[in-house]
Amino acid sequence: MHRKTGGWRRLLAVAVVCVGCSLMSVAARAAEPITIGFGMALTGGLAAAGKSALLAMQIWRDTVNAKGGLLGRPVKLVFYDDQSNPATVPEIYTKLVDVDKVDLIVSGYGTNLIAPAMPIAISHDRLFLGLFGLAVNSEFHYPKYFSMLPAGPDPKHAFSEPFFKVALAADPKPKTLALLAEDAEFPKNASEGVRDLAKQNGIKIVYDRTYPPGTPDFTPIVHAIQATNPDMVFVASYPPGSVGMLRAATESGLKTRFFGGGMVGLQYTSVKEQFGPKLNGVVDYDWWIPAPTMQFPGILDFLKNYQAKAPAVGVDPLGWYLPPFAYANLQVLGDAVEATKSLDQDKLADYIHSHPFKTIVGDISFGSDGEWSKARVLEIQWQGIKSNSLDQFKDTKIEPILDPPEYKTGTVIAPYNGGAGG
């Protein structure tokens, strides 16, 4: 009898130890951070935007952690510099998934840096949220990809459509167009839309060329474009090319009715300060500016926080262009995690596909290929710029929204005259 009692006591002791170990394991896991991995352009041609996006993501992390994290666990960002170089991306994401074993992945900044990460996400069956990628999923059709870009379900056309709408509303309507694009993924996708829209609207393309990344001098290109005397000049370019093309256009006195369209980088505060009045007359895309028509709940508080931190880390002091969307991208991810109470990739993807999200850049829902259900591409024009001062660029009156109508704050000034007008 005593032997039996002793046996039960030993079994009970073992059970208590096992339960204790189990509880300790659960507690230890609860203390482990949820890791979100990504590459980001911290050096190279996209670094001005990439570093501002990183600050926005760190603000989101700090905000979430101050409220207890996600699923009761702190959030940790695991990131590497992709150097604005697509060739670095596959290795970065392979390391994040296979070595770092992060819980979730999101993209770095821009189409050229998202596209090479897609095969890694797909082969590992991972949820993947892209930041400012134009039509990245149009070839893959991957059901776990979602795009933080207001280009809607038909992004290739939606991106350039507002430029055409603004130009075609003019009297007389433009008849000819010059198209210049960088030889890279984003400009390629944008150019396809431009060609289609030109054909649909009976506009003759009189110049259609690409240029290699790193082109040092755009003056010969501007001269070749001017020789065709186009009514419209659409440029699809990344920041170094945008800066080079605008410099050549102003120095050469390019004359056309409408110039711009798809020039990435002109939205950066540093570029605005660099060119000042030379931006006058350029018609370009944007995604958000603090116009009265676009002050969504929470965004001004975010910008106040961002702008207070920006000087210390040397990033874009205004933060209008990319930071709100970098923050909103993680808002979507975080809300999905909390709603599903899970890190399961399938459950998260199903939830994001089937639910709307309230973010600082407005209400968002996702449709086919993970694109926004509705496009919201802004067409703006720089007007009345008198100097290169930062304070001047805080006034949205010099950057009126021309389209879409529900956000419109001004009307176009034409023709473009090498930056001398506006």
Regions found by a protein language model. Name each.
Residues 102-207, 257-284:
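Extracytoplasmic ligand/sensor domains, especially the bilobed periplasmic-binding protein
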Residues 150-153, 249-327, 338, 393-394, ...:
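Extracellular/periplasmic periplasmic-binding protein-like sensory domains
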Residues 23-30:
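Sec/Tat signal peptide C-region and signal peptidase I cleavage site
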Residues 31, 55-77, 169, 199-202:
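Signal peptide-proximal N-terminal region
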Residues 34-58, 80-87, 109-110, 180-189, ...:
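Extracytoplasmic "Venus flytrap"
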Residues 12-23:
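Bacterial N-terminal signal peptides
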Residues 35, 48-55, 68-140, 211-218, ...:
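Beta-alpha junction/loop-to-helix N-cap segments that form part of ligand/metal-binding clefts
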Residues 34, 353-422:
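Solvent-exposed, acidic/polar segments of extracytosolic/periplasmic ligand-binding ectodomains
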